[in-house]
């Protein structure tokens, strides 16, 4: 199956800072990673948005 695009949105301010490619089959849980948010100016949890 082809890769699909998804975004990682900051849990604090909601801005979509990163884009990723995920496998075609959707999982029930969404990816959560700690990344730097340029709008907040600190490391925050970023969650996958579809």
Curated annotation (Swiss-Prot):
GO molecular function, one term: structural constituent of ribosome
Entry keyword set: Ribonucleoprotein, Ribosomal protein
Family: Belongs to the bacterial ribosomal protein bL33 family.
UniProt protein name: Large ribosomal subunit protein bL33B
SUPFAM superfamilies from the UniProt entry: Zn-binding ribosomal proteins
InterPro entries reported for this sequence: Ribosomal_bL33 (IPR001705), Ribosomal_bL33_sf (IPR038584), Ribosomal_zn-bd (IPR011332)
GO BP terms, alphabetized: translation
Any matching Pfam family: Ribosomal_L33
Gene name, Swiss-Prot/TrEMBL: rpmG2
